Amino acid sequence: VRPALLGLSALMLGAAGEAPSLVPPVAPACISSPFGTREGAGPRASRLHGGIDLPAPAGAWATAAAAGRVAAIRRRGAAGLEIDLTHPGGWVTRYAHLGAVVPALASGKREVAQGERLGRVGRTGITYGTHLHFELLADGVRQDPAAHLALGPCR
């Protein structure tokens, strides 16, 4: 049985190193759609929502939640334009539905500082409003980013 299915983090099982210290990747930030199984009708019902959605206006800056190294910039189906950053200990942060990537990253810059601009929030992929979809993975297993950020639900 996979750790995520038991509600245990990979960290608790020793599969990943210590999680990076995270700051919200958009400001101001609140969670419009939490991590976990989504219920409802339609083709994406009862599927894992592998991150959190942080509403932001189109064109707002998405910034690095932790210092890291750019591992991928790609367009991927429902996620649209996304960036993956790797962090020590087997951790990855993922930023999806971007409208644009900063030119330096698109030109090959690889190291980023915490809070550094990555791109602009957009509506690429499948989305029901402008927001940043933010994921946290430990050795490839999705974790709830909200457990590492001081964020609450949008009101």
Tell me what each language-model feature is.
Residues V1-L5:
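Bacterial N-terminal signal peptides that target proteins for export
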Residues L6-M12:
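Bacterial N-terminal signal peptides
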Residues G14-E82, T86, Q114, R123, ...:
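Surface-exposed, glycine-biased beta-strand/turn segments
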Residues H49, H87, H97, H131-H133:
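Histidine-centered active-site/metal-ligand motif
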Residues T63-A64, I73, P88-G115, D139-V141, ...:
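Short histidine-centered loop motifs in beta-beta connectors
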Residues L132-G140:
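A short hydrophobic beta-strand segment most commonly corresponding to one strand
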